[in-house]
Amino acid sequence: MHRLLILVLCIPAYGQTLCPATPTYSICDITFDIPGTMPRDTELNAEFRGPSHRTFLVRAFRSFGNRLTVRFSPSEAGPWDVRLSSTLAQFHDKQFQITANPSDSNGWIEPANLHHFRYTGGAALAALTPPHLWVGDTLPVISGTTLESWVTARARAGVTHVRMQVPNLMDEAAFDELDVRLALVNKQNMVADLVLTPPAGDRQAREEFFRYVIARCAARNVTWVILSDFEKFPHARDLVREISSYLDEDPFHHPRTVGATVTSGVFADEKGMEFREYGSPDWRISAVEDQIYAKPAVSVIQAVSADEFRHQLWNDTMSGTYPEAVTTDPAMLTYLGVWKKAFADTRHWELEPFFDVDNGRGLSLPQTEYLIYIEKPGPVVVRLDGKHKWNVEWINPLDGQVIESKDLKDENYNGSTPDNSHDWVLHIYREGHKEGLKSYHFESRPVLMQDVEVDAGKVPFEIAQPAGDTIPAAAAVPYAAKLKRETKASRNMIYLWTGEVTADGEGYRVLGTATSGEFHVPAGIVHHFPATLHMRVYGLNGLGKLYSLDQNFGIAQ
């Protein structure tokens, strides 16, 4: 997608400039020049009605002092009727038409198939729209030719998303620079993940700011990230809900999430939150929450070394998340490109976490393919769904080299990594069966969420600590889970400890992910005393069954 040059077609009576015939999912700017002084409370809205009679209401934003710009992106080819409403009499209730031409764009993205994404366009029927593979990187503070080179390098590596910060002031020069970045990214068919931070000021100032952002940016191919790390903001839940209410005015309904230091799962059930974000390098958090929330997720991967980056990339993937990287080393970009190529050759939009493996973590589409990450090289055992002819290959996550192995005709794979010098990825698949599934354009099977076992009598562990009914507000608190009975599945239990002060409404925070350890009551979740901490402990066993226990503790000041 690209920014079009404005056609010099002016209607003097209205001071109006239209855009030329515009390819679908490309920018169409319609400008209105206002003579004299324009009142601060001036409003101009445009209702676009497409060939299929779907309508979009778009606000104008102010630019160049006395200019109003309506920025739109048509989603289908053909004539679009435009009707204006405005506080300015010369524009109110005026009508005209623009034209959209067909393009090869697949459109915006949207959540699909529980934990994945698809495009909104690119096919005549919604059910036939292509899947979207999220591969993200984060834009550093650069400009000019350096910016162009950076974007080009990401496109070559297969990156499909670029994360960037939106200015938190209504500064026209800053937003002009943002427009340049957005145009470069979208031109390479990459989505811009826009991180939103509120300006200083009251609610009225925030509303004015976010309306400006939506009017100026929503016609681009974007997603919205509310706050960078919500946990750092006081009364974060109210602030997130407020900003989300402004985003409800996005006429294109781009996906949104909340930026998190640890997890935005606390907002997963909120209106409009369409995917989750993880900022913690601890893959256990997303592994457990993938079994709880029927929404896709991305992990922000920040690592000091390239090796650490690669391990986190693949571990987070096996937890069911897509990568949103912060590459600070050329090797990191190489590893991200290897990841992209590996998944582009799979039915990635149908893969879900797979647990029946020894010395590895996996994803699978039953009866079709398995992708297993072996972090510690050595022997690996994979119990497959049925005795079929399976193709087997090893992928080197450092350079993408593929080593083909002997075909397998069994329901179990027993083998070892090609060498023990680094981590490996094992790909087991049925080539002929995968080819046959091409007639299923998106979903070849129903995907259901499991029911979490909450019956204490059936949960294979208990809360051993904290002991007693009260915990301190400021001191370290020990926590521990104790297995009631040990089995092969329970020996590999993954725990997630969360705490919430329900009365104060901030939602839960992660307290720990180990069998035992210590935590401090997060300050941001307690506003009033006396207070009660609602603790919940999840246990995900080695076969993928999820359990939970709850217990309340008074918080002593």
Which residue ranges define each predicted feature?
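Aromatic- and carboxylate-lined catalytic core of secreted/periplasmic carbohydrate-active enzymes
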Residues: 16-21, 38-43, 295-299, 305-406, ...
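Short, solvent-exposed loop/linker segments at the N-terminal edge
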Residues: 19-25, 36-39, 469-476
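Active-site mouth of glycoside hydrolases
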Residues: 43, 89, 103-275
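Short, solvent-exposed loop/turn segments at the edges of extracellular beta-sandwich modules
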Residues: 87-89, 539-545
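Extended acidic/polar, glycine-enriched regions
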Residues: 56-114
